[in-house]
Swiss-Prot record:
Localization of this protein: Mitochondrion; Membrane
Topology in membrane: Single-pass membrane protein
Family named by the database record: Belongs to the LCL3 family.
Lineage, top ranks: Eukaryota, Fungi, Dikarya, Ascomycota, Pezizomycotina
This protein's name: Probable endonuclease LCL3
Length: 282
């Protein structure tokens, strides 16, 4: 059809342009599709085998293994245990604890500040053991020496047993401020851990403290209704032999064994418990 005579060529061009379909709605899917294709092409074009080359793979494996190994070592050997109740069951009869003695409460128990790793971990020259009561509060492990029973000190209104002071003084002189290693066996009813204890008087000569107390006549074999803890039959035999020899020689508390009023630490505690029960019933 012929356009009217007054219609110009420019108008015709504008009409042609306006009659073209809009392409905006088709552009966005096209862009997304193209981007997806570009990413897939880039991924496929990446040479992933480059990361498997020995020059890249070996350092990565070594670094990862080193980090995991360091974490395991820290958790197993360098983590500090604040109190006896925090000792993991996996430690009992399997591991030992190294620490510095901060106080001696009686003739057969004391407290240590756990120093995992010892001098190799910097304790004593890079890291200091606290000394104030405030710093040590809730930060010491209460240890009961396995297999031995020392004479009682005066406490809770009870009198002191003969040789109680001597046993306490001996243990204090041997342990206070020293490094010890405790082979832990089990917890007891007083939130302590029962352990065989070795004190380092010299660098390479640890001394079994419980065994030495028996030899000096400053303790007896621990006898209990539920069974005493020695750390094994061999250790028990060694302790009983030491007690028998001290008794034969009349050392320490065995000097007065012939006396009619002589009491073992176990007999003394049983008598005190009976007196306390009698007071409670009246």
């Amino acid at each position: 059809m012929r356009w009217l005579f007054w219609t110009s060529e420019n108008d015709k061009d504008e009409c042609k342009c306006n009659n073209k379909p809009s392409s905006n709605s088709d552009e966005k899917p096209s862009i997304i599709l193209n981007s997806s294709k570009d990413w897939n092409a880039l991924s496929n074009a990446t040479n992933w085998s480059h990361f498997l080359e020995p020059s890249n793979l070996i350092p990565t494996v070594l670094l990862t293994s080193g980090i995991l190994f360091a974490v395991r070592i820290h958790r197993r050997y360098l983590r500090r245990i604040p109190e006896a109740t925090n000792i993991s069951p996996s430690y009992l009869r399997q591991r030992s604890i190294l620490g510095k003695v901060t106080s001696v409460g009686d003739g057969d128990n004391f407290r240590i500040y756990h120093t995992p790793g010892g001098m190799l971990a910097g304790w004593g020259w890079l890291r200091k053991v606290p000394t104030s009561k405030k710093e040590l509060k809730n930060n010491t492990i209460h240890i009961r020496i396995a297999g031995v029973d020392a004479p009682e000190l005066a406490h809770f209104g009870r009198p002191s047993q003969p040789f109680g002071e001597e046993a306490h003084t001996w243990l204090t002189n041997r342990l206070i401020g020293r490094r010890i290693r405790a082979y832990v066996y089990r917890p007891d009813q007083y939130s302590r851990v029962v352990a065989t204890v070795y004190a380092y008087r010299f660098l390479f000569f640890p001394q079994d403290i419980g065994l030495q107390m028996l030899r000096e006549g400053l303790a007896t074999i621990y006898e209990a209704k539920s069974g005493a803890e020695f750390g094994g039959p061999k250790q028990e035999k060694k302790y009983r032999d030491a007690e028998a020899l001290a008794k034969k020689k009349g050392k320490g508390l065995w000097k007065a064994k012939a006396s009619s009023d002589w009491e073992s630490p176990r007999d003394f505690k049983s008598r005190m418990n009976a007196i306390d029960q009698g007071k409670g019933s009246t």
